[in-house]
Amino acid sequence: MDHATLAMILAIWFISFHFIKLLFSQQTTKLLPPGPKPLPIIGNILEVGKKPHRSFANLAKIHGPLISLRLGSVTTIVVSSADVAKEMFLKKDHPLSNRTIPNSVTAGDHHKLTMSWLPVSPKWRNFRKITAVHLLSPQRLDACQTFRHAKVQQLYEYVQECAQKGQAVDIGKAAFTTSLNLLSKLFFSVELAHHKSHTSQEFKELIWNIMEDIGKPNYADYFPILGCVDPSGIRRRLACSFDKLIAVFQSIICERLAPDSSTATTTTTDDVLDVLLQLFKQNELTMGEINHLLVDIFDAGTDTTSSTFEWVMAELIRNPEMMEKAQEEIKQVLGKDKQIQESDIINLPYLQAIIKETLRLHPPTVFLLPRKADTDVELYGYIVPKDAQIKYLLTYGLLEEILMHGKMLIFFRPKDL
């Protein structure tokens, strides 16, 4: 059998399979939330566009705050209003609490080793307990306030030095270096980068590659039957990126565990890594779980913060009168020479409004991780079918603007907040 004949047989089988599946699914179509009519085979893929959150906000104007789409062979429900989200999270949380696993995050069994993608289970509850008690407790966050201030001061001194030398400042790189060092100091008691080195740029590119690959459209997500062949090559690239990032963490962990190391566990540094290694010794965590937990935290905690900061500065440079107003507010509240403290932020409402407006226009992430219906669930008067994926649009404020004004307000306007 030649390759052309084999390809034709596979294509006929593939089309027939999805046609039969479509016929059987038409019985429940009337119960689904409203949405645009899907095309054969590809469904509504073409209607998503390059900016899905804006596409979904526009679709919500036509079809309402709960939309059903068919992306390839996958039924997708988009939640785009606070009212629907409240019903989903407060009343229907249990049958909608598990995750739809994108094909890309199965790289290196990442979905089995991290709290983000695990189903509700004893293992997931243990991860959640460890995170709440040891990583994000008020005591832990209060304890690191001093070096948070030190890292911000370090950023200030770097920018001041560049200004004195007449050098341009790469805002994204500077913010990323600060975010990276805040996390690495909290977790490892070391700084992983320096403002004048290329290390932070390399780390940033690695994190960006991971975030980009996870967020890319993937044929294997639209047609799960293709998952085993990884048609877009995303899973392979992501596995490589995971390995590079884990290698960084493993070098730090091995140094900590080395008997002759000055930072070995016999010497208590009282950082998060010490806690994780203690849990490892007590068989509460495996080394793989520690590595992939660190991957999640450093992915989520560095790129999102630095990209938001970069957009804040971009909008202020684009709107000099707003920058001047923010500077004036800081001078009035703090005086000319006092350095800003975390406790001062509550007295800077215009600065807070700038941050909120930046997050409205340039959200670092527009969707929560996708959920999955374990069974047919009634939501907002409609049926969410079993195995449908649920996407929650974090920027549902876009929808509210459309309903109020008939269009999205894309101008930077912190004074209205």
Swiss-Prot record:
Q: Which SUPFAM superfamilies match?
A: Cytochrome P450 (SSF48264)
GO cellular component: a single term: membrane
Q: Where in the cell is it found?
A: Membrane
Recorded hits in InterPro entries, A to Z, give: Cyt_P450 (IPR001128), Cyt_P450_E_grp-I (IPR002401), Cyt_P450_sf (IPR036396)
Q: How does it sit in the membrane?
A: Single-pass membrane protein
Q: Which GO terms describe its molecular function?
A: heme binding; iron ion binding; monooxygenase activity; oxidoreductase activity, acting on paired donors, with incorporation or reduction of molecular oxygen
The annotated pathway is: Pigment biosynthesis; betalain biosynthesis
Q: Where does the chain cross the membrane?
A: 4-24
Q: Which UniProt keywords apply?
A: Membrane, Transmembrane, Transmembrane helix
Entries under Gene3D superfamilies matching the protein? Cytochrome P450
Query: Which superkingdom does the taxonomy of this entry point to?
Result: Eukaryota
What function does the entry list? Inactive cytochrome unable to convert L-DOPA to cyclo-DOPA in the betalain pathway and producing a yellow mutant phenotype. A frameshift replaces 108 amino acids of the active protein found in red beets (AC I3PFJ5) with 27 new residues followed by a stop codon.
Q: Which family does it belong to?
A: Belongs to the cytochrome P450 family.
Q: Give the matching PANTHER family.
A: CYTOCHROME P450 76AD1-LIKE, CYTOCHROME P450, FAMILY 76, SUBFAMILY C, POLYPEPTIDE 5-RELATED
Q: What is this protein called?
A: Inactive cytochrome P450 76AD1
